[in-house]
């Protein structure tokens, strides 16, 4: 299936996929997803933003899986950092479905950060900042955070220690994980974990929410 910039996901495909994740989107949100995918395909020829070449799989794996986490974001206008944002997942889809969020997209790769800035600009996303930095170097620029999230960061001990540190003081972390990572993450100190939630239409993919122990 083509992944050229000319390919546009249909409104029907987006609505059908979102319904399978128990998500309801407005016409405007559907249009934002369509615009986002067009920018993604254009840039993916120059910057490796996703290895997935099937637009429908991108819709399910990146957009719907990201937006599925919105039910675990506790406050409508909370401060949320997406660490290792890459192609903007999960931070930008979360912003699309929860437009009152204050979002920080943290990405150390300059080319990927430039892509993120273009998406933010073209979609007209307010209260959304792209930070070109390693997460370990951030503190007062983002603190205090209500939620730190990540889909593919790894290095869980250092990441969770940073999120719990006084200079960041994140109240919660929201992670998209494979089943083999669950035990490692739940063994980390400073956090109490909810029960993992299976991600629809996936094999051994889970959402895990942790709350910082004061």
Where are these regions (language model features)?
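Active-site phosphate/pyrophosphate- and oxyanion-stabilizing loops and adjacent acidic/basic residues
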Residues: 67, 92, 161
């Amino acid at each position: 299936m083509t992944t050229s910039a000319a390919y546009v996901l249909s409104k029907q495909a987006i609505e059908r996929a979102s319904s399978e994740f128990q998500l309801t989107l407005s016409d405007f949100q559907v249009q934002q997803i369509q615009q986002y995918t067009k920018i993604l395909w254009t840039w993916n020829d120059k910057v490796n933003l996703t290895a997935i070449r099937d637009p429908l799989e991108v819709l399910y794996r990146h957009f719907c899986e990201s937006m599925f986490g919105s039910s675990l974001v506790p406050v409508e206008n909370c401060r949320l950092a997406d660490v290792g944002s890459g192609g903007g997942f999960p931070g930008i889809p979360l912003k699309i479905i929860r437009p009152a969020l204050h979002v920080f997209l943290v990405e150390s790769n300059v080319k990927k950060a430039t892509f993120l800035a273009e998406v933010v600009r073209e979609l007209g996303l307010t209260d959304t900042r792209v930070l070109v930095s390693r997460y370990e170097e951030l503190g007062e620029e983002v603190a205090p955070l209500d939620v730190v999230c990540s889909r593919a960061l790894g290095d869980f001990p250092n990441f969770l220690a940073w999120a719990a540190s006084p200079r960041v003081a994140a109240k919660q972390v929201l992670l998209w994980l494979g089943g083999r990572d669950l035990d490692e993450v739940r063994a980390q100190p400073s956090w109490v974990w909810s029960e993992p939630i299976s991600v629809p239409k996936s094999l051994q993919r889970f959402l895990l929410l942790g709350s910082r122990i004061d």
